[in-house]
């Protein structure tokens, strides 16, 4: 089904262009739906990263992924929220379990060889995170966002789905929220 991590290294030794990944993991109000972009220093992802970080707006505050305060993952990763943050409990899930889960998924992707360690200082990642207003279980938020981020990174690096895979599903696709 998916290319093994070691094979990814043979396919992509250098990240020279922007790549896109997506993953949906979990269920209920803690469901994680991750969209992300990965790109090289000097590219459009870096420009979007800097612009987003410099221009927060009410209910949408970009934040750096951190393993813990003062420890960012490498590649440097920016988290943006898909849903307007309306209350303190929703903010606490974003600025806590989701933030840490994304950072851990990025570092595990480097450790697993999915993201090239030798380029970690020259890659930027933007991760769009969904935290539903009714989400409450911080452990599920962490688990689902960790798994979804890892899967989205792998899909981006593998170029998945391929055009052929998307064409094969176009008439039978079943979106869980449609």
Curated annotation (Swiss-Prot):
GO BP terms in the entry: carbohydrate biosynthetic process
Catalytic activity of the protein: 5,6,7,8-tetrahydromethanopterin + formaldehyde = 5,10-methylenetetrahydromethanopterin + H2O
SUPFAM superfamilies reported for this sequence: Ribosomal protein S5 domain 2-like
Annotated disulfide bonds: none
Gene Ontology molecular functions: carbon-nitrogen lyase activity
Entry similarity comment: Belongs to the formaldehyde-activating enzyme family.
Protein name: 5,6,7,8-tetrahydromethanopterin hydro-lyase
Organism of derivation: Methanosarcina barkeri (strain Fusaro / DSM 804)
Lineage: Archaea, Methanobacteriati, Methanobacteriota, Stenosarchaea group, Methanomicrobia
């Amino acid at each position: 089904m998916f290319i093994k991590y070691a094979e990814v290294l043979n396919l992509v030794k250098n990240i020279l262009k922007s790549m896109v990944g997506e993953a949906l993991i979990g269920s209920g109000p803690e469901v994680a739906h991750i969209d992300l972009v990965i790109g090289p220093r000097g590219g459009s992802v870096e420009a979007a990263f800097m612009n987003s970080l410099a221009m927060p707006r009410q209910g949408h505050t970009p934040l750096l992924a951190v393993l813990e305060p003062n420890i960012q993952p490498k590649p440097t990763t920016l988290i943006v929220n898909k849903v307007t943050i309306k209350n303190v409990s929703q903010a606490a899930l974003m600025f806590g379990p989701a933030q840490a889960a994304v950072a851990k998924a990025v570092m595990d992707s480097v450790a697993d060889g999915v993201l090239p360690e030798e380029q970690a200082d020259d890659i930027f990642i933007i991760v769009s995170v969904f935290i539903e207003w009714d989400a409450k279980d911080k452990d599920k938020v962490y688990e689902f966002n960790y798994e979804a981020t890892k899967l989205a990174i792998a899909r981006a690096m593998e170029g998945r789905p391929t055009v052929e895979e998307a064409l094969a599903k176009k008439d039978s696709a079943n979106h869980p929220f449609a």
